């Protein structure tokens, strides 16, 4: 996002910098307590301290997971590009099932998911909330996925980095691992304060792995390739989860305003349609009716840098980041309109 980090995070960083010693960091008790308290207060999810494995980034966690779990990998497209590259980097086969889009509403295609799973599939990569389609998966959908994982004996790696960015007031984030003891046993949950509090450059994330055997496999896969977590990232994480509630509420209200303004503008252009964004600050825009060979290049030529849907497994779509000031958004919308009308 284009917003400054919360003042409490900046204060925590300044205090840590004033300390003056920047050796390797090791998580401290009050940091762990802030994570545990945050997960329980926000999501009703009570975890044990030993379940936490600290990471320098969430994408690192995706790649470690693919190394830690033997067998083929299953995911659903469109999806955040590292979901598609991590299995390849780990020498794992990747099976894809397309999500279904009905009247602009994205949902799971249970038949496609089952057909894409093979006897060799052992890992399911779940994006929750979903990047880029903006869904906050509800309890029924998650329980269906948990049943699917149990029936097919799958480990579920749930990327929940956008869990603090649910925009719809009637929606709430439900951690996959909180559904049941079986869901917890077969889960690796990846989280970070980076998206919600705009601190991705500080390099701090974590995995929550309740099962001891699975956790040991994950730790073994990290050996020798995953560095220590940035000590400044750890300090920022503690402050973000402990001291930034008011800032977070203001952020959500502002993002809702951006989303609603964006939806009106995009859906008002001929040949463009935007899916409703329940969570994240990312809009998923269908421009297939414009008939462009390369939509991202077309809009870039009109001064608007958008993520190419082809990278997510969905050519003809574009992703727009609306985590910005209203003035920047209005400028972007003007350029989007020019691009649409230039076809």
Language model features with spans:
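Conserved core segment of the aminotransferase class I/II
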Residues: 180-256, 334
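N-terminal small-domain helix-loop-helix segment of the aminotransferase-like
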Residues: 1-57, 242-243, 342-343
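Helix C-cap/helix->beta junction micro-motif
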Residues: 90, 151-152, 183, 269, ...
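Conserved PLP-anchoring active-site segment centered on the Schiff-base-forming lysine
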Residues: 67-87
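Conserved glycine-rich beta-strand-loop-beta hairpin in the small C-terminal domain of fold type I
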Residues: 238, 247, 253-263, 273-286
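PLP-dependent enzyme catalytic core of the Aspartate aminotransferase-like
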Residues: 114-115, 183, 294-307, 312-343
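Active-site phosphate-binding strand-loop segment of PLP-dependent enzymes
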Residues: 101-170
């Amino acid at each position: 996002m284009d917003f400054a980090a919360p003042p409490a995070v900046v204060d925590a960083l300044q205090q840590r910098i004033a300390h003056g010693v920047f050796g390797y960091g090791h998580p401290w008790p009050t940091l762990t307590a802030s994570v545990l308290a945050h997960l329980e207060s926000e999501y009703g999810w009570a975890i044990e301290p030993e379940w936490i494995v600290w990471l320098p980034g969430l994408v690192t966690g995706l790649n470690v997971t693919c190394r830690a779990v033997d067998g083929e990998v299953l995911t659903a497209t469109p999806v955040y590009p590292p979901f598609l590259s991590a299995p390849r980097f780990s020498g794992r086969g990747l099976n894809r099932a397309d999500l279904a889009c009905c009247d602009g509403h994205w949902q799971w295609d249970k038949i496609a998911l089952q057909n894409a799973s093979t006897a060799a599939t052992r890992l399911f990569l779940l994006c929750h909330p979903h990047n880029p389609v903006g869904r906050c998966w509800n309890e029924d959908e998650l329980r269906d996925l948990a049943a699917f994982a149990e029936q097919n004996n799958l480990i579920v790696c749930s990327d929940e980095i956008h869990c603090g960015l649910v925009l719809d007031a009637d929606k709430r984030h439900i951690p996959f691992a909180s559904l049941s003891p079986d869901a917890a046993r077969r889960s690796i949950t990846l989280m970070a304060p980076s998206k919600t509090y705009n601190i991705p450059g500080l390099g701090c994330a974590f995995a929550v792995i309740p099962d001891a055997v699975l956790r040991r496999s994950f730790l073994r896969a990290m050996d020798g390739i995953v560095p220590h977590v940035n000590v400044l990232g750890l300090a920022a994480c503690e402050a973000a989860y402990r001291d930034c509630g008011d800032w977070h509420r203001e952020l959500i209200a502002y993002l809702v305003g951006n989303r609603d303004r964006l939806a009106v503008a995009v859906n008002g252009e001929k040949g463009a349609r935007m899916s409703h964004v329940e969570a994240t600050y990312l809009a998923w825009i269908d421009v297939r009716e414009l008939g462009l060979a390369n939509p991202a290049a077309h809009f870039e030529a009109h001064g608007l840098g958008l993520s190419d849907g082809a990278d997510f497994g969905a050519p003809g779509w574009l992703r727009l980041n609306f985590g910005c000031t209203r003035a920047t958004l209005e400028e972007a919308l003007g350029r989007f309109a020019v691009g649409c009308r230039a076809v």
